[in-house]
């Protein structure tokens, strides 16, 4: 690698500049309505109960300060990625996210959905308003992505090619419908879906690499991947690094900002430590996300 990994957040711009990049595209960032964000952070405060490990949120800041942090880091484009945990939430989350993106040009307009009769209507409405990415969280939502109520939604998204960031792996918590089997079934029905597998599918990394190799529109995001925090809990087999290298054009930078238990720079340093080369880093940190979401340099 031609440049050293960043040592802290202040060093991040030096890192991407030395790679010859105009900044970063992060496909896994959360901005949520204040009451929802407060509940998320309260959950992480009790992480030892939920996960058996502490999860000290590194950026528990007011909204404007979080936006400023991303700007200083050089994150040029990012989504809000709302997700519901029960029926009746998705439509108002979508309205909030639409308004937030309209107020901040660096934000990729985001939306979500839940298996409920209204889903095809509000997904169509989001598409008509120019949504650029959807978010689905299988474990938090506690639903099967193959639910028949979602068939018309998936069919429409396969047709439009709109990316869907989907948390479907069994980490950090297993759910009834997490893991590769439900996603395999979904892709067998809708092979043209433009999916972004969050967290590289941890801990089922290998099985989700299989899916990315099998389906040309399946991508993987790096959220929390290869960091010291994650490696202690859900290690990645170094023997699979060549497969990750071969999928260079479909791996996307993700961070889970702001609710990460370490500085943002640690995610970038972890990716650099994989030693997959500068071209791989350039693709992951900028080019792939910029291409998928139409972000200009």
What are these regions (language model features)?
Residues 28, 70, 97, 126, ...:
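Conserved, mostly hydrophobic/aromatic
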Residues 2-27, 36-77, 247-250, 261-297:
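Mid-to-C-terminal alpha-helical segments outside catalytic/metal-binding sites
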Residues 70, 74-89, 96-114, 135:
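Short, well-structured secondary-structure segments
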Residues 60-70, 92, 115-126:
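Short, acidic/polar
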Residues 89-95, 118-121, 143-153:
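Active-site-adjacent beta->alpha loops and helix N-cap segments on the catalytic face
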Residues 3-8, 132-133, 143-252:
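Catalytic pocket-lining loop regions of alpha/beta-barrel enzymes
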Residues 49-60, 82, 108-117, 140-145:
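Active-site mouth loops of central-metabolism enzymes
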Residues 28-34, 167, 199:
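Histidine-centered divalent metal-coordination motifs
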């Amino acid at each position: 690698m031609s440049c050293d990994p960043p040592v802290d957040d202040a060093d991040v711009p030096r890192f991407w500049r030395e790679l010859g990049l105009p900044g970063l595209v992060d496909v896994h960032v959360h901005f949520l309505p204040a009451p929802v964000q407060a509940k998320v952070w309260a959950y992480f405060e009790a992480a030892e109960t939920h996960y058996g490990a502490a999860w000290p949120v590194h950026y528990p800041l007011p909204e404007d300060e979080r936006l400023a942090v991303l700007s200083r880091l050089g994150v040029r484009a990012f989504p809000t990625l709302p997700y519901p945990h029960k029926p009746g939430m998705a439509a108002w989350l979508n309205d909030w996210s639409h308004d937030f993106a309209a107020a901040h040009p660096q934000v990729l307009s985001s939306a979500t959905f839940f298996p409920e009769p209204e889903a095809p209507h509000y997904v169509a409405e989001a598409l008509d308003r120019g949504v650029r990415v959807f978010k689905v969280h299988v474990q938090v939502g506690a639903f099967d992505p193959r639910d028949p109520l979602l068939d018309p939604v998936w069919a429409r998204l396969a047709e439009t090619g709109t990316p869907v960031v989907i948390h479907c792996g069994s980490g950090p918590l297993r759910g009834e419908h997490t893991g590769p089997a439900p996603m395999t079934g979904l892709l067998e029905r809708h092979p043209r879906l433009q999916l972004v597998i969050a967290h590289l599918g941890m801990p089922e990394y290998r099985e989700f690499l299989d899916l990315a190799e099998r389906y040309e529109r399946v991508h993987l995001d790096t959220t929390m991947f290869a960091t010291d925090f994650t490696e202690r809990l859900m290690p990645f087999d170094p023997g699979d690094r060549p497969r990750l290298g071969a999928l260079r054009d479909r791996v996307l930078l993700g961070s889970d900002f702001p609710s990460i238990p370490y500085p943002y720079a640690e995610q970038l340093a972890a990716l650099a430590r994989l030693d997959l080369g500068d071209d791989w880093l350039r693709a992951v940190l900028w080019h792939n996300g910029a291409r998928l979401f139409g972000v200009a340099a």
